[in-house]
């Protein structure tokens, strides 16, 4: 009887572990270019150090990007970004917490491209806003990539842009995110 109970307990534990599958990655890349003329890269920046988690069973996703990991071609711009605009000592991270709509775990078992949407909350510069954007999920081999493009307005996140710089920047800043999860 003990062996049957032990086997049943082990079986339930394994089933729960499989169903509660969670993927984690440190391969989350975020790029933005706030220039009015997108061909100019004066203020463009990228972080390749975001961390993301995907809970397969619940379709929940979370992303954390340390703001000091955004690097610019100009050291002075990077200093202004961290100290004067984003106040990264006070607000060190940008985050997203939400769910993927149109996602199911069976999609991870076969190569393909799937159009999903994400809905949740973005926190940037200490301000949290509701967020919704389309997401392209690409499953290929032993990895899944989530690509998302969206725009934000600096003033929506209480980010003050000085008058001298403001004419050079777009009202809405385009942001591109690419998150790659290894499928183990």
Question: Could you tell me what each predicted segment is?
Answer:
Residues 1-25:
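Bacterial Sec-dependent N-terminal signal peptides
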Residues 20-184:
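Low-complexity, acidic/polar, glycine-enriched regions of mature
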């Amino acid at each position: 009887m003990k062996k049957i109970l032990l086997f049943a307990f082990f079986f339930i534990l394994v089933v729960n572990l499989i169903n509660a599958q969670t993927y984690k990655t440190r391969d989350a890349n975020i790029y933005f270019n706030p220039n009015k003329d997108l061909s100019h890269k004066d203020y463009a920046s990228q972080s390749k150090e975001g961390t993301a988690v995907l809970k397969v069973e619940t379709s929940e996703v979370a992303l954390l990007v340390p703001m000091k990991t955004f690097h610019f071609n100009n050291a002075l711009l990077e200093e202004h970004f961290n100290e004067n605009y984003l106040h990264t000592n006070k607000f060190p991270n940008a985050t997203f917490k939400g769910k993927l709509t149109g996602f199911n775990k069976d999609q991870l078992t076969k190569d393909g491209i799937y159009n999903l949407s994400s809905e949740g909350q973005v926190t940037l510069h200490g301000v949290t806003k509701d967020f919704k954007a389309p997401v392209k999920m690409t499953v290929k081999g032993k990895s899944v990539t989530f690509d998302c493009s969206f725009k934000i307005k600096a003033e929506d996140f209480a980010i003050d842009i000085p008058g001298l710089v403001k004419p050079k920047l777009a009202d809405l800043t385009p942001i591109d995110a690419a998150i790659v999860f290894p499928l183990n």
